[in-house]
Design a protein with these regions (language model features):
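HotDog/MaoC-like acyl-thioester-processing domains
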Residues: 68-70, 74-76, 80-115
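Catalytic strand-loop segment that frames the active site of acyl-thioester-processing enzymes
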Residues: 1-28
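Hydrophobic/aromatic beta-strand elements that line small-molecule binding cavities or substrate pockets
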Residues: 1-2, 60-62, 91
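Hydrophobic residues in beta-strands and at strand termini
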Residues: 15-17, 64, 110
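Residues at secondary-structure transition points
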Residues: 23-35, 55, 59, 68
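Active-site helix/loop of acyl-thioester processing domains in fatty-acid/polyketide metabolism
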Residues: 31-51
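Hydrophobic beta-strand-centered segment that forms part of the acyl-chain substrate-binding groove
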Residues: 44-74, 79
Length: 115
């Protein structure tokens, strides 16, 4: 995975599709698609944090819209809502031709720095 771009409330991750990521039909495994989407959403959420704070995924829901057969996927994570304890993100996973492959919404839990 490669972090392509980060702005306040937004992050873009790309990932080359490799044989090791395939499920038995030859498509990218849903777990890998989820990991890419979660990573983009996590980076987007991290842009909203105060110094010393961290975030982890509390829950996520993903819709797989098309099988991933492209050589590369691009995941764009965007913050929908940022509160003191929870950050809600939405990530869209697309192929190189801009076809939507998956859509994820996730809740990120904010962890305060140790005292």
């Amino acid at each position: 995975m490669k972090l392509e771009h980060v702005d306040k409330g937004k992050a873009v991750i790309s990932c080359e599709n490799k044989k090791e990521f395939s499920q038995y039909l030859g498509y990218m495994h849903g777990g890998m698609v989820s990991a890419i989407a979660d990573t983009a959403g996590g980076h987007a959420a991290a842009t909203m944090l105060k110094e010393g704070y961290k975030t982890v995924t509390s829950e996520l829901k993903i819709h797989f819209l098309k099988p991933v057969v492209s050589k590369k996927v691009i995941a764009t994570g965007e913050v929908l809502s940022a509160g003191k304890r929870l950050i809600i993100v939405e990530t869209t996973v697309r192929d190189e031709e801009d076809n939507m492959l998956a859509k994820m919404i996730a809740t990120m839990f904010v962890i305060e720095p140790s005292k």
